[in-house]
């Protein structure tokens, strides 16, 4: 009981708005039925091959790049609550339309439009969490948001897998309803958009007149962080690209159900591991968490190459992968907000997201061609090689961070 109280107690005394955002994350994630199955929808329902799926993903990612820049600029210059609500309403409308029409390329286009507006609001959502916490409580605030997202995801992918064959239209409508419910929570209960901070890192001080380029030149380790994010995004993307394709090749349409179960296991392990890591390993620095997390992600995901048709091992590897995801997320979310002026959080977030999106989309196109020509074993090998590069970059970041931001280490 004492341990349970310790786990829950670490999330006490955060600002009320953080808890509202937490419940909003839960509700939204409960309706996230489409995105885990998107690759399988394109493959199984619409008949695209792996290369074409990767090309579609790359084109959509390229189209989102200017939206990321717009989202970052808006997050740094406009009311963040208004941005989130406006984008959510567009997302709801698109998902309702996609659910009401017969499944086709138009349905996918509507879903991608919805995802574009979700992309625009992303920097505002992340910056709002940072605005409502200070440097000391930020990791717990982000940890709570991450926990909420995965609480909602425990059943969503499994439900999506069950609806996949005959009731996919209903999955679109459930996604719309969940997003609308979350939006109403924000409209009604989010009143403050920032709080007085007890502790502000010197690196967070406002610098209104300084450009994004100047900040990146001045803090070059942030560019290295973006490269880690790029390689990491490509490797992590295989959870929703190569892995479901592999399941579909082994089990046919039933692969969607198996992948849905794996995704639910992912969410369940996050729920169990997040408070444990935050409570007992909270003193590990964010850059070290990144290194540990990326290493476990590479190990857990790449090992699927060696366990084809061994169902029990799928779930063991998913546990390893997910523990890595927890470390990575708890490291990367506070990283930038402690090292970047508050006036630039949105734009730097957009820059990192663009790098990540470019790596994952171009990488998936290459991987799709490799998969179509050489098969799954070679494709997984390519993921492993990229993973080695990722681990090296994450190690370099952890070693250079103290020199780049010495005051953060003096504060401990």
Predicted regions mapped to residue ranges:
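Juxtamembrane intracellular "pre-TM" segments in multi-pass secondary transporters
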Residues: 1-15, 193-225, 411-412
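Helix-loop boundary and gating motifs at the non-cytosolic
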Residues: 7-61, 221-228, 232-253, 258
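Residue-level signature of mid-helix packing/kink "hotspots" within the transmembrane helices
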Residues: 33, 61-69, 153-154, 267-275, ...
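Conserved MFS/SLC helix-loop-helix module at the cytosolic interface between two early adjacent transmembrane helices
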Residues: 65-102
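Helix-to-loop junctions at the C-terminal end of transmembrane segments
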Residues: 67-79, 273-286, 371-372
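Structural signature of the two symmetry-related core transmembrane helices
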Residues: 82-96, 288-303
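Helix-loop junctions at membrane interfaces in 12-TM secondary transporters
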Residues: 99-111, 305-317
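Cytoplasmic helix-loop-helix junction between adjacent transmembrane helices
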Residues: 112-149
């Amino acid at each position: 009981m004492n341990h349970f109280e310790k786990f829950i107690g670490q999330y006490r005394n955060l600002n009320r708005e953080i808890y509202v955002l937490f419940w909003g994350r839960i509700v939204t994630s409960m309706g996230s039925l489409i995105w885990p199955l998107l690759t399988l929808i394109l493959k199984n329902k619409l008949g695209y091959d792996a290369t074409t799926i990767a090309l579609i993903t790359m084109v959509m990612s390229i189209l989102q790049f200017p939206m990321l820049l717009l989202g970052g600029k808006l997050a740094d210059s406009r009311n963040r609550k208004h941005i989130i609500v406006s984008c959510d309403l567009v997302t709801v409308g698109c998902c309702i339309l996609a659910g009401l029409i017969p499944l086709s390329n138009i349905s996918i286009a509507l879903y991608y439009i919805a995802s574009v507006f979700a992309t625009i609001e992303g920097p505002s959502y992340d910056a709002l969490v940072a605005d409502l916490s200070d440097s000391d409580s930020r990791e717990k605030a982000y940890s709570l948001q991450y926990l909420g997202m995965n609480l909602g995801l425990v059943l969503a992918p499994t439900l999506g897998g069950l609806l996949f064959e005959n009731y996919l239209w209903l999955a679109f409508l459930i996604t719309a309803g969940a997003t609308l419910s979350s939006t109403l929570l924000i409209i009604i209960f989010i009143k403050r958009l920032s709080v007085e901070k007890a502790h502000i890192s010197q690196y967070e001080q406002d610098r209104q007149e300084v450009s994004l380029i100047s900040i990146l030149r001045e803090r070059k380790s942030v560019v290295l962080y973006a490269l880690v994010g790029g390689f990491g995004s490509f490797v992590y993307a295989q959870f929703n690209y190569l892995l479901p394709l592999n399941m579909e090749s082994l089990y046919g349409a039933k692969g969607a159900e198996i992948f849905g179960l794996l995704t639910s296991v992912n969410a369940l392990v996050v729920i169990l591991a997040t408070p444990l890591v935050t409570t007992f390993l909270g003193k590990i620095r964010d850059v070290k968490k990144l290194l540990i997390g990326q290493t476990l992600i590479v190990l857990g995901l790449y090992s699927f190459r060696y366990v084809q048709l061994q169902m029990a091992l799928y779930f063991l590897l998913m546990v390893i992968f997910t523990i890595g995801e927890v470390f990575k997320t708890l490291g990367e979310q506070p990283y930038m907000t402690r090292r970047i002026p508050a006036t630039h959080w949105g734009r730097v977030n957009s820059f990192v997201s663009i790098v990540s999106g470019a790596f994952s989309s171009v990488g998936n196109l290459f991987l799709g061609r490799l998969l179509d020509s050489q098969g799954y074993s070679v494709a997984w090998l390519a993921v492993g090689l990229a993973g080695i590069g990722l681990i090296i970059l994450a190690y370099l970041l952890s070693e250079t961070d103290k020199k780049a931001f010495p005051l953060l280490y003096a504060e401990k």
